[in-house]
Design a protein with these regions (language model features):
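His-Asp phosphorelay/catalytic-motif detector in bacterial-type signaling
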Residues: 4, 48-50, 75-80
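Charged docking surfaces used in two-component/phosphorelay signaling
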Residues: 18-26
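Acidic, metal-coordinating helix/loop segments flanking the phosphotransfer/catalytic sites
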Residues: 33-51, 94
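Active-site residues of response regulator receiver
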Residues: 55, 85
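Receiver (REC) domain active-site loop signature in two-component systems and cognate sites
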Residues: 58
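Short, glycine/charged-rich "phosphate-handling" switch motifs in NTP-dependent
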Residues: 102
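C-terminal output helix
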Residues: 109-118
Length: 124
C-alpha cells in the first residue's frame, strides 16, 4: 500500500491551518502543522514532507525567509512550496517566485483550489 504524501502547513492562524488540514486530509494527505517559519524548519528536520504550504506574514520567521531557507537546505531544496497569504501585491508575489515559490494563493481561499494546487505539485 502506498504511503500518503505528507504536507506541512505553516500559518500563524490556527483557523487557516484547520481549514487547509481538513481539506487535505479529506483527499488522503497526511498533514503536519507549524505556526511560524522557525517551527516549520524544525518540523522539516524531523519529518519528510512532500510539499510545504506557507503564509507570508508570520511572527518569528516570515514565509519568504522560510522559503529561502528551504531552497538552501540540501535535504529539502526540491520540496515544492505554495504561498497561501493575504499578500496580493505583485512585488511580494515576484519576491516569492524569485525565492522559489511554485504557486501563490491569496486568502481568503477556496479549499478546493488549494487541494488542486497541491495535487498538481506533488509527484507520485
Amino acid at each position: 500500500m502506498e504511503m500518503a504524501k505528507k504536507v506541512l502547513i505553516v500559518d500563524d492562524s490556527s483557523s487557516v491551518r484547520t481549514v487547509a488540514r481538513l481539506a487535505l486530509r479529506e483527499k488522503g494527505y497526511d498533514v503536519v502543522e507549524a505556526a511560524n517559519g522557525q517551527e516549520a524548519l524544525t518540523k522539516l528536520d524531523g519529518e519528510r514532507c512532500h510539499l510545504v504550504i506557507s503564509d507570508v506574514n508570520m511572527p518569528v520567521m516570515d514565509g519568504i525567509t522560510l522559503l529561502k531557507e528551504i531552497k538552501r537546505h540540501p535535504n529539502y531544496k526540491f520540496t515544492p512550496v505554495i504561498m497561501l497569504t493575504t499578500e496580493a501585491g505583485e512585488d511580494k508575489k515576484q519576491e516569492g517566485r524569485a525565492a522559489g515559490a511554485k504557486a501563490w494563493i491569496t486568502k481568503p481561499f477556496q479549499p478546493q483550489i488549494l487541494v488542486d494546487a497541491v495535487s498538481k505539485l506533488i509527484v507520485a
